[in-house]
Amino acid sequence: MPSFTLIVPTYNAGTARWNEWFHAFQKQTNQPSQLIIIDSSSTDDTRNIASTYTNNIIVISPSEFNHGGTRNKALASAEESDFVVFLTQDAIFENKNALEEILSLFNDKNVAAVCGRQLPHHDANPLAIHARNFNYGTETLIKSKNDIKNLGIKTVFMSNSFAAYRRSVFEALGGFPEHTILAEDMFMAARMIQAGYKIAYCAEASVRHSHNYTPRQEFQRYFDTGVFHACNPWIQRDFGGAGGEGFRFVKSEIQFLLKNAPFWIPRALLTTFAKFLGYKLGKHWQSLPLSTCRYFSMYKSYWNNIQYSSSKEIK
């Protein structure tokens, strides 16, 4: 049976949710050859709880954390394996064969990455419920260069909240970008598609993972998304923008709320405006003072080592 490494970045995971994570993990029918926790100096019981299940715990300072570089660092310390699975501390396995199912799509030798389905947490608000249902459907998909014309940027949709990679391809393509504000998963998926590989979405492998973000938090998250695309313009150049998908999302959200939670419509409209404004400002981050970028961003420490460049590429 092919071997795989499971990597989980953590920071103050919270006793109840972290114990729930391990309870679901222990039920998995397919267990990793190695579980690696890379922790950003948590001040709660995160490491103590994890030490019950693994000796492979790497501790870094909070300022060292980066969505790409931190995951690369964890994998660099891993034993040999065929695949690597990344999960977040708040993504709880929903079915006991989730790992088995996500790895099964690698039976196609041309598949280089797979992401699983994300269901809303049981305490998710209506906006979070709709977002998960919209973005994570019930049908498994395998995507290649041939799908770019129809799917556009959705071709390279990937989420490291629950994703698996063929390690040989991942490493051959250089791993995640070392310094990225977010979307290291989309970056790698795009590189894989460009290199002629396929990426997949496995609807049968599911976790519960969602966030009840406020409009302010959505503004921050979309500001960071705009920064990412400004710094990596080749992704939208080669795969297209998300404008049409955004309009489809808003239409679907309003229809969902009219049927299920009409009093949430004003909140949804405010959130949509916050997302739009945040994204547009993020796309033009180099026109803003660095202090303003840090204030607008959800990922504050990212801005500690930024240099401006005329090409808008992060150096």
Curated annotation (Swiss-Prot):
GO terms (BP aspect): O antigen biosynthetic process; single-species biofilm formation
GO MF terms held by the record: glycosyltransferase activity
Catalytic activity of the protein: alpha-D-galactosyl-di-trans,octa-cis-undecaprenyl diphosphate + dTDP-beta-L-rhamnose = alpha-L-rhamnosyl-(1->3)-alpha-D-galactosyl-1-diphospho-di-trans,octa-cis-undecaprenol + dTDP + H(+)
The protein's Enzyme Commission number: 2.4.1.377
Pathway(s) annotated for this protein in UniProt: Bacterial outer membrane biogenesis; LPS O-antigen biosynthesis
Membrane-spanning intervals of the chain: none
InterPro entries to which the protein is assigned, alphabetical: Glyco_trans_2-like, Glycosyltransf_2, Nucleotide-diphossugar_trans
Superkingdom of this protein's organism: Bacteria
Gene3D superfamilies: Spore Coat Polysaccharide Biosynthesis Protein SpsA, Chain A (3.90.550.10)
Keywords linked to the UniProt accession: Glycosyltransferase, Lipopolysaccharide biosynthesis, Transferase
Keyword Oxidoreductase on entry: no
Function of the molecule: Rhamnosyltransferase involved in the biosynthesis of the repeat unit of the lipopolysaccharide (LPS) O-antigen region. Catalyzes the addition of a rhamnose to the galactosyl-undecaprenyl diphosphate intermediate.
Family designation: Belongs to the glycosyltransferase 2 family.
Name under which the protein is recorded: O-antigen chain rhamnosyltransferase WbaN
Organism name: Salmonella anatum
